[in-house]
Swiss-Prot record:
<dbReference type="GO" id="GO:0035091">
    <property type="term" value="F:phosphatidylinositol binding"/>
</dbReference>
<keyword id="KW-0813">Transport</keyword>
<comment type="subunit">
    <text>Monomer.</text>
</comment>
<dbReference type="GO" id="GO:0001786">
    <property type="term" value="F:phosphatidylserine binding"/>
</dbReference>
<comment type="similarity">
    <text>Belongs to the NPC2 family.</text>
</comment>
<dbReference type="GO" id="GO:0032366">
    <property type="term" value="P:intracellular sterol transport"/>
</dbReference>
<feature type="signal peptide">
    <location>
        <begin position="1"/>
        <end position="21"/>
    </location>
</feature>
<dbReference type="GO" id="GO:0000328">
    <property type="term" value="C:fungal-type vacuole lumen"/>
</dbReference>
<keyword id="KW-0732">Signal</keyword>
<dbReference type="GO" id="GO:0032934">
    <property type="term" value="F:sterol binding"/>
</dbReference>
<keyword id="KW-0445">Lipid transport</keyword>
<dbReference type="InterPro" id="IPR003172">
    <property type="entry name" value="ML_dom"/>
</dbReference>
<dbReference type="GO" id="GO:0015918">
    <property type="term" value="P:sterol transport"/>
</dbReference>
<dbReference type="InterPro" id="IPR014756">
    <property type="entry name" value="Ig_E-set"/>
</dbReference>
<dbReference type="GO" id="GO:0031210">
    <property type="term" value="F:phosphatidylcholine binding"/>
</dbReference>
<dbReference type="InterPro" id="IPR033917">
    <property type="entry name" value="ML_PG-PI_TP"/>
</dbReference>
<protein>
    <recommendedName>
        <fullName>Phosphatidylglycerol/phosphatidylinositol transfer protein</fullName>
    </recommendedName>
</protein>
């Protein structure tokens, strides 16, 4: 199963070590499925509306919906490329996420990530997580050494993902509140 929290965290982890996002956890997907028992009926209400757009974003080279947000602010992580296959992600299919980036400073225990996930204008998640606890789920661990790294992760996306537009934003900080990165992605799952 998939959770957008982990999409954001994996994106960070994959981009933090090279550098998000993508391993998803069941909790929030199940919450979304519960909220939207008949998601198909919700699609028209979002089709003409815009998601909340974050200003000051910068595209990341490669084939991915992920962008750097708060791009004018100094960040410790610099992404060279992020590739998501297939792009856009497809419910019921495997997703491959590859990221290449450089980390200016080693990330130690105490680092954290603030994650927000919206379905259209509906906020599904707004929580803070221990980054070092979460990256274990994507085969990484703290300390995350500075320097250039490449990471590839395969994830299964469940068929039960409600169709619609999802906005994922993740802001990561060191234990001393230095800005590691801000990543955002708009993901659209079409009606099947």
């Amino acid at each position: 199963m998939v959770s957008f929290k982990n999409l954001a965290i994996v994106t960070l982890a994959v981009t933090t070590t090279s550098v998000e996002g993508i391993s998803f956890s069941n909790i929030y997907l199940n919450k979304a499925i519960t909220i939207f028992k008949n998601p198909t009926s919700l699609i028209p209400s979002f089709s003409n509306s815009k998601l909340i757009n974050y200003q000051n974003t910068k595209p990341i080279p490669g084939d991915s919906p992920i962008e750097v947000c708060d791009a004018s602010e100094k960040q410790l992580l610099h992404l060279d490329e992020v590739i998501v296959t297939p792009n856009p992600p497809v419910a019921g299919q495997n997703l491959t996420f590859t990221a290449v980036g450089t980390l200016d400073k080693t990330i130690e225990e105490g680092a954290y990530v603030e994650v927000e996930v919206r379905y259209g204008f509906i906020k599904l998640i707004h929580q803070t997580y221990d980054l070092c606890e979460e990256i274990v789920k994507v085969d990484l661990q703290c300390p995350i050494k500075s320097g250039k790294q490449t990471i590839t992760k395969n994830v299964e996306i469940p068929e039960e993902v409600p169709p619609g537009k999802y906005l994922v934003v993740a802001r990561a900080y060191t234990k001393d509140d230095e800005y590691i990165t801000c990543l955002t992605a708009t993901i659209i799952f079409p009606v099947q």
